[in-house]
UniProtKB/Swiss-Prot annotation:
Subcellular location: Secreted
Organism for this UniProt entry: Conus vexillum
Keywords (A to Z) from UniProt: Disulfide bond, Knottin, Neurotoxin, Secreted, Signal, Toxin
Signal peptide limits: 1-22
Domain notes: The presence of a 'disulfide through disulfide knot' structurally defines this protein as a knottin. The cysteine framework is VI/VII (C-C-CC-C-C).
Name of this protein: Conotoxin A11GB
Source taxonomy: Eukaryota, Metazoa, Spiralia, Lophotrochozoa, Mollusca
Disulfide bonds: C55-C72, C62-C76, C71-C80
Expressed in which tissues: Expressed by the venom duct.
GO molecular function terms attached to this record: ion channel inhibitor activity; toxin activity
Gene Ontology, cellular component aspect: extracellular region
Similarity remark: Belongs to the conotoxin O1 superfamily.
Database matches in Pfam families: Conotoxin (PF02950)
Length: 81
């Protein structure tokens, strides 16, 4: 019985904590994301999604620090293939 009461109190406390610490104006967060995306559509250079300029050519030597993310095509197995 005591364990059940403690569990109920813990759940109520965590629920209250979530409500108290919640973002008060969460709609503004979505609005800001929309405005940022709209700006990136008007100015493609501002977009962080255009990462093709950081791609490495084929036969680029890649190691533990330069992994498959830097190869434009294929995979990294000691060199970009």
């Amino acid at each position: 019985m005591k364990l059940t009461c403690m569990m109920i109190v813990a759940v109520l406390f965590l629920t209250a904590w979530t409500v108290v610490t919640a973002e008060p104006h969460s709609s503004n967060v979505l609005e800001n994301l929309y405005l940022k995306a709209h700006h990136e559509m008007e100015n493609p250079e501002a977009s962080k999604l255009n990462t093709r300029d950081r791609c490495q050519r084929a036969n680029f030597v890649c190691d533990a620090f330069h992994h498959a993310a830097v190869c434009c095509e294929g995979v990294c197995v000691l060199v970009c293939a």
